[in-house]
A protein has these predicted regions:
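N-terminal beta1-alpha1-beta2 submodule of the flavodoxin-like/Rossmannoid cofactor-binding fold
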Residues: 1-94, 158-195
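Amphipathic alpha-helical interaction elements
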Residues: 9-13, 100, 116
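Short, solvent-exposed amphipathic alpha-helical segments in soluble enzyme
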Residues: 22-23, 96, 126-129
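Mobile beta-alpha loop/short-helix "lid" or hinge segments that flank ligand
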Residues: 36-47, 101, 136-157
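A generic structural signal for secondary-structure junctions
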Residues: 52-53, 97-100, 132-135, 182
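Charged helix-capping and loop-helix junction motifs
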Residues: 91-98, 124
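His-Asp phosphorelay/catalytic-motif detector in bacterial-type signaling
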Residues: 104-106
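Short, glycine-/small-residue-rich phosphate/pyrophosphate-handling segment
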Residues: 108-149, 164-168
Length: 195
């Protein structure tokens, strides 16, 4: 993936998932990708009232305008998603809902996490149809990290058996996203989007 955006959406005081976001940024950078972390809390979009497309050109809030340009320029997306009450993080969902066409025709991968042993699996189930509805191809390979605070240290470096399992799963996960990103770039160059 030449240009990858990694999205993270927790607003909690003790954000454990940021460790996984940093891990993903580092590992994809080591593979040669141009990676940027998009932290929903840092971007600071309000609760959804108006989507980006509902503003006149040049009239969207500056943070929304800047993020729209980054989304359009990206070849692929990676959502680092925590599981909240059997579902998706509200902060990450709110950020994604501000955009629509900007997401179209690119692959998206999911790396989920939780404090418990289920590794964010239920968040993954919620995100797959959402990403598809928003015009992305949700790639079939996912990563789930259970007990995230034990699997990654504060710098996002793997620790213990959970960290070992993550490292072992990463290369296949990244290769699948790379394949879909290459396919999307080639098809867009060859034929262009259907609309």
């Amino acid at each position: 993936v030449n240009k990858l955006l990694v999205f993270y959406g927790s607003y909690r005081a003790d954000r454990m998932g940021i460790r996984l976001a940093h891990y993903m940024v580092r590992r994809f950078s080591e593979r040669g990708s141009d990676v940027e972390l998009i932290d929903a809390q840092a971007v600071g979009l309000p609760m959804l009232d108006r989507m980006y497309k509902e503003y006149a050109p040049g009239k969207a809030p500056p943070a929304m305008e800047a993020l729209a340009r980054k989304i359009v320029a990206a070849e692929a997306f990676l959502f680092v998603a925590g599981e909240y009450n059997w579902g998706m993080q509200p902060g990450l969902k709110n950020l994604t809902d501000h955009f629509r066409e900007e997401w179209f025709w690119r692959p998206a991968a999911l790396a989920t996490y939780s404090a418990g042993r289920l590794a964010g699996a239920r968040a993954s189930y919620a995100w797959h149809p959402t990403l598809a509805e928003m015009g992305m191809v949700a790639v079939p390979s996912t990563i789930g990290v259970g007990q995230v605070s034990a699997a990654l240290d504060v710098e996002g470096l793997p620790t213990g058996s959970g960290g070992e399992a993550l490292d072992k799963a990463f290369d296949k996960f990244a290769a699948v996203l790379d394949w879909w990103a290459d396919a999307a770039v080639e098809q867009t160059a060859r034929k262009g989007p259907p609309y």
